[in-house]
Amino acid sequence: MKALLSIDYTWDFVATKGALTTAEEGQKIETALVQVTKEFIEAGDFVVFAIDRHEKEDAFHPENKLFPPHNLAGTTGRELFGSLAPLYEQYKEKTNVYWIDKRHYSAFSGTDLDIRLRERHITDLYLTGVCTDICVLH
């Protein structure tokens, strides 16, 4: 069984004026990222949207000292970017589509991702997303 982990493809990481944007480089992959995500969903494979989430006044989170505010809960910056947003809205009620709020670089840190993958007997994990030196790497 296989799964796709879609990591941090949000306005703050991709939009031209996003807080920590990859800008044009992130925007270039939109069509391919959306297409592969749709293919995984429609094939019945497990698709996880692992999305960075921060609180504006979280003085204890180490990222607040490293980076400007980004992916803040309740802001446009945290919304999925471009045509990935309507794709998620179209399929979000399917049992093979799962959303994880992550507070750390790793989608495994402080989440139930490991158990979700194990209970589905996932053997092949595919990664897509932006900020590959941080968000995808970890």
Model-predicted segments: where are they?
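Cofactor-binding loop segments of dinucleotide-utilizing enzymes, especially the Rossmann-like FAD-
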Residues: 52, 130-132
